[in-house]
Amino acid sequence: MKAKEIRDLTTEELRQKVNELKQELFNLRFQLATNQMDNPMRLKEVRRSIARAKTILRERELKQQRA
């Protein structure tokens, strides 16, 4: 996901998305371990999407604390 797409989500949707991405990452790692993975670049994409989402969540938390 792009950062713009992530920013359009509500905070609750964003938390849910992080959980979904973590589950997908777990499944991808399992596929990698069993040599069933079709696209190994998907691991990188999912990890980066999780990082983007967590960064935006943290920005929102800090913004609320300052307000």
From Swiss-Prot:
Pfam families: Ribosomal_L29. Belongs to the universal ribosomal protein uL29 family. It comes from the Bacteria. GO terms for biological process: translation. The keyword Ribosomal protein applies. Keywords: Ribonucleoprotein, Ribosomal protein. One of its GO terms (cellular component) is cytosolic large ribosomal subunit. This is Large ribosomal subunit protein uL29. One of its GO terms (molecular function) is structural constituent of ribosome. Coiled coil: none annotated. PANTHER family: 60S RIBOSOMAL PROTEIN L35/50S RIBOSOMAL PROTEIN L29, LARGE RIBOSOMAL SUBUNIT PROTEIN UL29C.
